[in-house]
């Protein structure tokens, strides 16, 4: 679930309506054009080439990691590299076993089915998915009561690509049915800088390398955020500058948007200040913290915390969340001696 404040943040890593058109236009079509995630790219390249040489479908693939790192893009690339169709859906959208059956029976041989947020799939639907993934068949119950009978439908061989931000919530039987598992990590500043330069070329936005670097530093390791910031800074450059994005133009634009040098904004600051001021630096439990800042616990856990953990600003322990010395330093607050 996405919180209200997160929906309105320019640096949220979750998908916003404004992202759809720009992401489609900027999305790479091949693994060669896909920047970053080198280990996952190498693995997928080998497995795709092997499957194509044997004229087989690719093994089922699980992509996991924080939102905005390119899981949907990778699924699209895999289908493109395999030369097959891509069908996209999500865990919450498949409410009943019949919904899944309708999707699976309409696939062609070797097609790719991409299920986003697969950790949110209904358990009864998941049980129907097991034989579909393993034996490429569908068990359907016809009728009710004593006259009910089961029939087995053969399915075309297909590749399921599941994407999740919470791999730990997948059941073991489901996780075990994925032959290829790829963890997507936050991008480096250098990788994001290259992505910004590539995107600016496609969008016909004039940008200097130091301007791209400034955007990359504030993009929270996430390409989706980098592209969104580029779009906003391009507008700023056209109105307030000569249309060229330099490091100064990027800094001025992002300061106006409330994005600091590390990519943090008012929501991050509120979360950190709540831990530091209300709870003396922690530890504080997740539910208590969520109530204190008026946010959903899942939004805190999935959207806010991962980047703060990456920066070393907070720590998650058995007793709750604790603000670390780096957070105090960034907020220019003296670190208490007793800690």
UniProtKB/Swiss-Prot annotation:
GO terms under cellular component:
cytoplasm; Holliday junction resolvase complex
Coiled-coil region(s): none
> Which residues does ATP bind?
26-27, 68, 71-73, 134-136, 177, 187, 224
Q: Which InterPro entries match?
A: AAA+_ATPase (IPR003593), AAA_lid_4 (IPR041445), DNA_helicase_Holl-junc_RuvB (IPR004605), P-loop_NTPase (IPR027417), RuvB-like_N (IPR008824), RuvB_C (IPR008823), WH-like_DNA-bd_sf (IPR036388), WH_DNA-bd_sf (IPR036390)
Q: Which keywords has UniProt assigned to this entry? A: ATP-binding, Cytoplasm, DNA damage, DNA recombination, DNA repair, DNA-binding, Hydrolase, Nucleotide-binding
Q: What is its EC number?
A: 3.6.4.-
* Catalytic activity, as annotated: ATP + H2O = ADP + phosphate + H(+)
Q: Where does Mg(2+) bind?
A: 72
One matching Pfam family: RuvB_C
Q: What is its main location?
A: cytoplasm
Q: What's any GO biological process attached to this entry?
A: DNA repair
According to the UniProt record, where is the region Small ATPAse domain (RuvB-S)? 188-258
Recorded hits in SMART domains, A to Z, give: AAA
- Compartments in which it is found: Cytoplasm
Residues annotated to bind DNA? 297, 316, 321
Record region (Head domain (RuvB-H)):
261-339
Which Gene Ontology molecular function entries are recorded, alphabetically?
Answer: ATP binding; ATP hydrolysis activity; four-way junction DNA binding; four-way junction helicase activity
User: What does the entry note on its domains?
Assistant: Has 3 domains, the large (RuvB-L) and small ATPase (RuvB-S) domains and the C-terminal head (RuvB-H) domain. The head domain binds DNA, while the ATPase domains jointly bind ATP, ADP or are empty depending on the state of the subunit in the translocation cycle. During a single DNA translocation step the structure of each domain remains the same, but their relative positions change.
Reported function = The RuvA-RuvB-RuvC complex processes Holliday junction (HJ) DNA during genetic recombination and DNA repair, while the RuvA-RuvB complex plays an important role in the rescue of blocked DNA replication forks via replication fork reversal (RFR). RuvA specifically binds to HJ cruciform DNA, conferring on it an open structure. The RuvB hexamer acts as an ATP-dependent pump, pulling dsDNA into and through the RuvAB complex. RuvB forms 2 homohexamers on either side of HJ DNA bound by 1 or 2 RuvA tetramers; 4 subunits per hexamer contact DNA at a time.
- Protein name from the UniProt record: Holliday junction branch migration complex subunit RuvB
Gene that specifies this protein = ruvB
């Amino acid at each position: 679930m996405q919180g209200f404040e997160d929906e309105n943040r320019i640096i949220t890593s979750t998908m916003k309506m404004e992202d759809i058109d720009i992401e489609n236009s900027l999305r790479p079509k091949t693994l060669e054009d896909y920047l970053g995630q080198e280990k996952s790219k190498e693995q997928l390249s080998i497995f795709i080439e092997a499957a194509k040489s044997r004229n087989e479908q690719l093994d089922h693939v699980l992509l996991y990691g924080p939102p905005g790192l390119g899981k949907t893009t990778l699924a699209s690339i895999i289908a493109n590299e395999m030369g097959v169709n891509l069908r996209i859906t999500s865990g919450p959208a498949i409410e009943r076993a019949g919904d899944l059956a309708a999707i699976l029976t309409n696939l062609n041989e070797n097609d790719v089915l991409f299920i986003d947020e697969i950790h949110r799939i209904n358990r009864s639907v998941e049980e129907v998915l097991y034989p579909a993934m393993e034996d490429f068949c569908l068990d359907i119950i016809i009728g009710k009561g004593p006259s009910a009978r089961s029939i087995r439908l053969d399915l075309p061989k297909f590749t399921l690509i599941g994407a999740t931000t919470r791999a730990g919530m997948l059941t073991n039987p489901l996780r075990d049915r994925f032959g290829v598992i790829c963890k997507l990590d936050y991008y480096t500043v250098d990788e994001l800088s290259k992505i910004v330069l590539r995107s600016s070329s496609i969008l016909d936005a004039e940008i200097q390398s130091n301007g791209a670097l400034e955007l990359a530093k504030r993009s929270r390791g996430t390409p989706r955020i980098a592209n969104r910031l580029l779009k906003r800074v391009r507008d700023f450059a056209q109105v307030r500058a000569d249309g060229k994005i330099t490091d100064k133009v990027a800094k001025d634009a992002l300061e106006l948007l409330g994005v600091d040098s590390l990519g943090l904004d008012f929501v991050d600051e509120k979360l950190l200040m709540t831990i530091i001021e209300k709870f003396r630096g922690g530890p504080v439990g997740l539910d208590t913290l969520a109530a204190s800042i008026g946010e959903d616990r899942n939004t805190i856990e999935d959207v806010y915390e991962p980047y703060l953990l990456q920066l070393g600003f907070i720590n998650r322990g058995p007793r709750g969340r604790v603000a670390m010395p780096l957070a105090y330093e960034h907020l220019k607050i003296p670190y208490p001696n007793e800690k």
